[in-house]
Amino acid sequence: VQPIRLQVQYRMHPCLSEFPSNAFYEGTLQNGVTEAERADSEEVFPWPCPSKPMMFWAQMGVEEMSASGYSYLNRGEAYAVEKIVAHLLQNGISPDEIGVVTPYEGQRAYVVNYLTRTGVLHPSIYQEVEVASVDAFQGREKQYIIVTCVRSNDRQGIGFLNDPRRLNVALTRAKLGLMMVGNPKVLAKQPLFRDMLQHFRDNKCLVEGNNINQLNECMVALPQARWKTRAAGLARFRAKQTIDEENASENYNVNV
């Protein structure tokens, strides 16, 4: 079946659809919802830019091999995830409205354990927060999505994250707010991630710091973005196919 090209999205706050539209749809993806329809209370989360419910929180912790020997985890990113989740819960967000997305089973298992054992709130509350793989979240949505990228190493390798379809899915699951945590120095080696990080920076949403209420703009150097490289173009095409195929499988409902 030939996928229908997505033209209108009804899920995301308009600022969250901007990068997917530019990266995968040549800027043609239209918004079927307004900012007012996707606005949350200003008290819910200390967004770096109050009018844009998104952020990339730079974490420089080193990745580790998981106990299985076949996956990866990142303790520093798990710490950041807990801080974000706790802040949302403490400000009235229901745990079933929060999703934590990661490309690695090792990180998924570690985050689940970290939240219940180390979190500042009662373990039973964290147990209601869904922590799952990128693939498990395809075709689904949450009010708030937290993405932990995991990879952080001297070799500058990002493994599964090289698949643009996974990035595409991760970026398009949130309705009201998107938080990402990762190592921008490592991720920026991949052209599509580099463009995404530059997008966060252009919107003053690429931040760093230890206190979630006092994050500062991250000044890490990023390679110059090259939107029209062959690699980036191919990545955008493949990632767009993921949304188109998902759209076709959902009875042609244009809901990214």
Walk through the language-model features, giving the residues of each.
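Helicase C-terminal subdomain and adjacent C-terminal extension
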Residues: 1, 121, 156-256
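Conserved coupling/interface region of RecA-like P-loop/ASCE motor cores
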Residues: 1-40, 103-105, 184
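Hydrophobic/aromatic beta-strand patches that form the interior of the parallel beta-sheet core
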Residues: 4-6, 55-57, 132, 145-146, ...
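Helical mechanochemical/support elements of P-loop NTPase systems and associated helical scaffolds
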Residues: 12-15, 74-80, 107, 163-166, ...
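Alpha-helical scaffold elements adjacent to nucleotide-binding pockets in ATP/GTP-utilizing enzyme cores
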Residues: 15-23, 110-114, 173, 195, ...
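Short, conserved catalytic or adaptor-binding loops enriched in Gly and charged residues
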Residues: 22, 44-49, 119-125
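Conserved helicase/translocase motor-coupling segment
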Residues: 31-114
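Conserved helicase C-terminal RecA-like lobe
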Residues: 87-101, 105-172, 184-188, 204-210
